[in-house]
Amino acid sequence: MQRSVLHTASQLAHGMCLLFPRTGAFRGLKGPSVSSNVGCKVILALDPPKRCLHAGAALFASKSSAVSSQPADTPRKVPEEREPLTSATEVPKQSPVESDASDPDPLQDKSISLVQRFKKTFKQYGKVMIPVHLVTSTVWFGSFYYAAMKGVNVVPFLELIGLPDSIVDILKNSQSGNALTAYALYKIATPARYTVTLGGTSITVKYLRKNGYMSTPPPVKEYLQDRMEETKDKITEKMEETKDKITEKMEETKDKITEKIQETKDKVSFKKIKD
């Protein structure tokens, strides 16, 4: 009797395990639903009730661990809106025309360096500065060469001003002698040469303006604009001349065609009258 009761209970438990392996058991648990693929395998043996109880415990443990392993929903962070940066191109810039118009005369501008004054003066007064520079450079080099010919020893002076020993040794042991010494002094005196050239250019420009040989030069930008306008005017004149010639040719051709048509009409009307 006891064995039959146990056998019946084992069959009922075995049926319950077969019914609930792939369904969502333990639906009372809070949280997201667990995948339905989790199940249990039932092995038929001599003692099925114990196997079914072990399978049910394993199913419960797997579902509870899956529920606890899932993190809680965290609120999403909304990205903060950044203000657009102002581009560097929005900074107002001074137009080149205004900068050119505000440039002072390089001969009178003392705020820039000597080399910059020399370059700007060359750009603006090149026709006057080149002859002045050639004359002053010839005088400088000739004076140094004459001093070297007269036996002036410049080596102690070069050592005194701190010239490199390599250059001083070349001057001491040089075969050319006077020419090389004069050239070395010529290069050393570059600041003085530039100053004399600028002064000579300024005096020459004032003299030429005073006697009416030279007018005040316009800025480079205005000069280029004038040259472009002259070129534009010449091109416009050429185009107008070409247009006039083409118009004359077209009128001549039109007159000839009109004459031919008129002659043809006269011939046709004459034939009709004759007939």
From Swiss-Prot:
Pfam families: FAM210A-B_dom (PF06916). The keyword Nucleotide-binding does not apply. Residues 109-221 form the DUF1279 domain. The chain crosses the membrane at residues 128-148. Keywords: Coiled coil, Cytoplasm, Membrane, Mitochondrion, Transmembrane, Transmembrane helix. Its main location: membrane. Residues 221-271 form a coiled coil. It is a single-pass membrane protein. InterPro entries: FAM210A/B-like, FAM210A/B-like_dom. Interacts with ATAD3A. Belongs to the FAM210 family. This is Protein FAM210A. It comes from Gallus gallus (Chicken).
